[in-house]
């Protein structure tokens, strides 16, 4: 039987580009401090998918597959992956000599134990739904035997949206939130205070992947800092002040007006990342009264997304109806007829048809992410004008994120998608399908059929058609309101060198202080 091979060197396409620029002397040492607006109440390697947690965990935790600079899946902890001709077996040859932070060498037993744990405990365990079993014929070979064709399996293994982190066997047997923060990354855990900071230090035993340079979330990664500290500073003005005072070297989510001021500071630099994320409004489809599709459709018809996004982002946005960006091959217009309709007459008609009696609708938001707070404020007023009884609840981000994963206690929740729109449709599978559906529409037959087609189709055109059907259904049933595409102002010390912005993730390897 012939097999297709994906070698480690595949996708490392930026090395030549880097070589074309003058060499810059990298410097080892120093303590890097970055500030972000929100934290996380879990660092469990298999139990979180938020952007805040990803920034904190990315330098510690690693996976078999990663995405490169162009979001193409490439091997990382694996040397190569071989795919059977019928697509029913994936054979990973592991890199030899890869060390965990404990000094123990990673073997196939650790990989199997990690995936077993992920498949049992992770909220995103649908990644493993097509896997029949995992074989480990020797210490450096792992074979995934599939129940059925799953054409996006490698894409999902590579996605950082919900990482399938490899941890030691002895950690994999522990319950949620009881593991030590151990993996194979270039930095290792030092300390964590959930409300204030995470600190990591350079892992001196790190075994970098072969190659000339880092590439996306893989390639040859080098830890230059002695330590990296991620500080949680919720107020934007306080983050900016800390940067100006030299207390931190990097901040994200800088307000537009503050960014303009920072641009005149010779000691600082500002990078504009647009698009950077997609603000959304989640809608609980099983909690009354938003379990009424007509009511959801009425609210969607009333909203003016331009007004919402202008307030949420200080004007740093683009209107976009799709859950992927316009340059993505899966971009389509299925959701366009439902987007930013702003039609009061139509909305009132749908509201009357829904039989809505003024029951309270609980809308969750938080001030950690100002775009979530501002978007909720504006949308709540638009919906009140329609005659909807909105009750706004302002929580901290970790509490809000936890509550929005429960089937009761809320109706709407201001949130955002960071990595998913950048990576593509397969990263939405965990959010828009089955038991992990973000709006709890786990028995929607249209989504079930479309995702099944997406996973079993070998032709790109067939997968595009399936994704178009998915986007149309999400919009028609109003499980999630897509608000638009937002930008992110990143500000940093001018002597922070090597930093490259990457949508949905902050990379602190191959970065140093001059």
Predicted regions and their residues:
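Surface-exposed binding/hinge segments that line
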Residues: 27, 93, 126-171, 180-193, ...
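Short, well-ordered beta-strand elements
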Residues: 29-39, 79, 89-92, 111-114, ...
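Detector for C-terminal structural segments
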Residues: 32, 50, 193, 197-198, ...
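N-terminal lobe/hinge region of extracytoplasmic solute-binding protein
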Residues: 35-85, 116, 182
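A structural "hinge/loop" feature
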Residues: 38-54, 77-79, 104, 149-162, ...
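Aromatic- and charge-enriched surface segment that lines or borders ligand/interaction sites
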Residues: 79-124, 137, 143-145, 242, ...
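Aromatic-rich, solvent-exposed beta-strand/loop patch
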Residues: 101, 145-163, 182-238, 259-277
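Structural transition elements
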Residues: 187, 318-353, 369-372
């Amino acid at each position: 039987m012939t097999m297709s091979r994906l070698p480690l060197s595949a996708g490392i396409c930026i090395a030549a580009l880097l070589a074309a620029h003058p060499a810059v002397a990298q410097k080892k040492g120093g303590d890097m401090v970055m500030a972000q607006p929100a934290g996380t109440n879990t660092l469990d390697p298999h139990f979180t998918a938020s952007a805040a947690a990803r920034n904190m965990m990315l330098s510690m935790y690693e996976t078999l597959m990663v995405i490169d600079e162009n979001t193409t899946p490439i091997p990382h902890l694996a040397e190569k992956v071989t795919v059977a001709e019928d697509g029913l077996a994936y054979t990973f040859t592991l890199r030899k000599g890869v060390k965990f932070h404990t000094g123990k060498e990673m073997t196939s037993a650790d990989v199997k134990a990690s995936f077993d744990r992920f498949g049992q405990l992770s909220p995103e365990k649908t990644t493993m739904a097509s896997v029949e079993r995992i074989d480990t014929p020797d210490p450096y070979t792992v074979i995934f035997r599939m129940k059925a064709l799953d054409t996006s399996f490698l894409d999902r293994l590579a996605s950082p949206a919900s990482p399938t982190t490899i941890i030691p066997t002895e950690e994999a047997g522990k319950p949620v939130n009881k593991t030590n923060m151990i993996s194979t990354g270039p930095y290792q855990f030092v300390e964590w205070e959930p409300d204030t900071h995470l600190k990591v230090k350079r892992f001196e035993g790190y075994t970098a992947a072969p190659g000339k340079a880092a590439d996306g979330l893989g390639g040859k990664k080098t830890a230059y800092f002695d330590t990296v500290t991620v500080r949680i500073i919720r107020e934007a003005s306080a983050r900016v002040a800390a940067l100006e005072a030299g207390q931190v070297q990097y901040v994200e989510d800088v307000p537009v007006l503050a960014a303009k001021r920072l641009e005149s500071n010779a000691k600082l630099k500002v990078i504009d990342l647009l698009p950077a994320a997609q603000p959304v409004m989640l809608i609980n489809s099983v909690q009354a009264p938003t379990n009424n599709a007509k009511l959801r459709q009425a609210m969607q018809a009333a909203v003016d997304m331009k007004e919402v996004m202008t307030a949420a982002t200080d004007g740093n946005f683009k209107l976009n109806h799709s859950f992927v960006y316009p340059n993505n091959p899966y971009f389509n217009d299925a959701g366009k007829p439902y987007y930013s309709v702003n039609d009061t007459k139509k909305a009132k008609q749908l509201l009357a048809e829904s039989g809505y009696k003024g029951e309270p609708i609980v809308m969750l938001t938080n001030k950690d992410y100002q775009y979530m707070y501002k978007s909720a404020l504006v949308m709540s007023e638009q919906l009140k004008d329609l005659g909807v009884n909105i009750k706004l609840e302002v929580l901290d981000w970790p509490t809000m994120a936890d509550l929005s994963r429960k089937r009761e206690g809320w109706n709407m929740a201001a949130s955002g998608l960071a990595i998913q729109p950048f990576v593509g449709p397969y990263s939405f599978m965990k959010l828009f399908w089955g038991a992990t559906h973000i709006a709890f529409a786990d028995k929607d037959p249209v989504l079930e059929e479309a995702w099944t087609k997406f996973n079993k189709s070998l032709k790109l055109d067939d997968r595009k058609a399936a994704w178009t059907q998915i986007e149309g259904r999400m919009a028609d049933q109003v499980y999630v309101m897509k608000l638009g595409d937002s930008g992110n102002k990143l500000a940093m010390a001018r002597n922070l060198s090597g930093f490259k912005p990457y949508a949905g993730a902050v990379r602190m390897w191959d970065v140093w202080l001059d």
